[in-house]
A protein has these predicted regions:
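Membrane-cytosol interface segments of multi-pass membrane proteins
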Residues: 1-197, 239-249, 327-361
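Interfacial loop-to-helix transition and helix-capping segments at the boundaries
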Residues: 9, 61-74, 156-170, 204-227, ...
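Aromatic-anchored segments of alpha-helical transmembrane domains
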Residues: 20-27, 146-152, 194-207, 257-270, ...
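Hydrophobic alpha-helical segments of integral membrane proteins
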Residues: 85-86, 124, 201, 205, ...
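Hydrophobic alpha-helical transmembrane segments
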Residues: 127-129, 178-182, 204-205, 262-271, ...
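Alpha-helical transmembrane segments of multi-pass integral membrane proteins
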Residues: 225, 255-357
Length: 361
């Protein structure tokens, strides 16, 4: 089975876009007067504020948009994870990876995640102690974070700090689900699991704790993750989705796709039942963006994608130090310094991570 839907560089570019969105979102939404996102729960009040800033824009409109929409970088990562698992473990290759049992598979991916988590979390703990207003960690929550089961505990949004590290618990759950239920199984099972996870959420109170807890776990991430698996299993998709230059798809079709996706993302965000499917158009729009990028821009975001894992664990550390500039001085001054330092510090963190031996399957 051959799938040329996304090249390696395009996947890396999508990671670059995703981590930039997440990094900027996690700074902007900490500024008190900025519009808040609907990530785990659906608050009508947040949409009302979004509508207000869209209809009465001011100088802070980009910050509002990054705060509200930036978290959708997470579904892009989930899509790429599902896509990558199929390409690595289900696609014939001259040098196929070793196939261990389910326990070996989960252990291998847990250790890969732990390499990132242990570096970022350790540095963050030191910084958090030194900076005023530190978070009160409890030993049992630290253990839960390191073992990546903290997502299943009550009120995860109040015990996971920094908040973005919830992603590690989500990923280990999705690895378990993939290996036990979806690995080399018929694609109908992927579709069925997506539908089941949607049904478990759709009847919840939009602002309730039940929905919050579901979306902190694999149930909330199954849609983009499952789409990645499905897209990777379509062998002829790449024939219609080549990068511009192959002439397989006219450039105007990508432009139309990007514009339509953007319209759907904004419109569907205002209704509870359509809100669940916004990640679909986020993914489609991101793919279209990558396909449209000129070479020089693709090279930049591809490089950002190459350090995205390090940036993921590093940016909360930099935010902890620089968020006070946005609180006390100018928002854009703080944002610019935050971005520059985050990129530089992420490169340093990557060097530390690379010194830790990689696990073997």
């Amino acid at each position: 089975m051959e799938n040329n839907f996304l090249t390696r560089s395009e996947c890396s570019a999508m990671r670059g876009i995703a981590i930039l969105a997440i990094m900027l979102h996690n700074y902007c939404h900490f500024i008190g007067r900025i519009v808040q996102e609907n990530e785990y729960q659906f608050f009508v009040s947040n949409n009302q504020r979004l509508w207000q800033v869209l209809t009465h824009p001011d100088a802070l409109l980009p910050v509002h948009l990054l705060s509200y929409f930036g978290h959708y970088g997470v579904p892009v990562f989930l899509f790429l994870s599902g896509f990558g698992l199929v390409m690595k473990y289900e696609t014939p290759s001259p040098t196929p990876p070793r196939e261990g049992g389910a326990f070996q598979f989960v252990k291998y991916h847990y250790l890969k995640l732990l390499r990132l988590l242990i570096v970022g979390f350790s540095i963050f703990l030191v910084v958090d102690v030194l900076v005023p207003g530190r978070f009160h960690f409890h030993w049992y929550n630290v253990i839960a974070q390191l073992l990546m089961y903290i997502n299943v505990l009550p009120e995860p949004d109040k015990i996971i700090w920094p908040g973005i590290y919830w992603f590690f618990g989500l990923m280990i759950q999705l690895y378990i689900v993939y290996r036990l239920f979806l690995y080399r199984q018929k694609s109908i099972w992927v579709v069925a699991l997506i539908v089941i996870c949607w049904l478990l959420q759709v009847f919840c109170d939009p602002e309730g704790e039940t929905l919050n807890r579901l979306r902190y776990n694999f149930i909330g991430g199954m849609l983009p993750f499952g789409l990645g698996i499905l897209f990777a299993r379509i062998p002829t998709l790449g024939l219609k989705c080549s990068h511009p230059g192959t002439k397989a798809v006219p450039r105007w079709e990508y432009i139309a796709t990007l514009l339509l996706s953007t319209a759907c993302i904004v419109t569907m965000s205002f209704w509870y039942h359509s809100w669940f499917f916004v990640p679909v158009f986020i993914i489609i729009g991101t793919v279209a963006s990558v396909k449209l990028m000129p070479g020089w821009m693709l090279n930049i975001v591809t490089w950002i994608g190459s350090i995205s894992a390090a940036m993921f664990v590093a940016h909360p550390i930099v935010r902890r130090l620089f968020i006070t500039i946005a609180w006390k001085q100018d928002i854009y001054d703080g944002l610019m310094l935050y971005v520059l330092v985050t990129i530089a510090f992420s490169w340093v963190v990557k060097q530390l991570i690379d010194r830790i031996p990689k696990p073997k399957l």
